[in-house]
């Protein structure tokens, strides 16, 4: 058991840190619990709503079910060195935001904050989960090369192939987490602007 018996005795916040197999921008995934959305919006990158309802068995689900403030930060592609800097920036910003440390004690805080806020410029601030393309190993799913997170897609656009043939976008939207690795149960997601 990792939490105090009385969860109200102090504020517990979970910042769940990740990278993805696809290239693209950093973003956050907020839950419907408490201040999750406000915490996620603080980082200045796009916020995805309702995605936690489509993905079960995650750390984010666990903390959300316990009604604790939690959100996920996706820093970028696994191999991108900038993902490390984005993660560091997210951690420092969150520590300041929840009152663990004062920003003036961090000499590079404004630079760290700028790292993420510059990424969020000219992008949709908040998007909502719309579609999940679930897969299983026997499907032999293969995403078409070149899709990035937050890339606009059109209804009918070829996205992937599997053992049954071509997979086309069921509607227009924004691509999220196209799968470019061997493991996973999610081929891709489609989100839409709120």
Tell where the protein language model's regions lie, with residue ranges.
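Structured catalytic-domain cores with a bias toward divalent-metal coordination
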Residues: 1-194
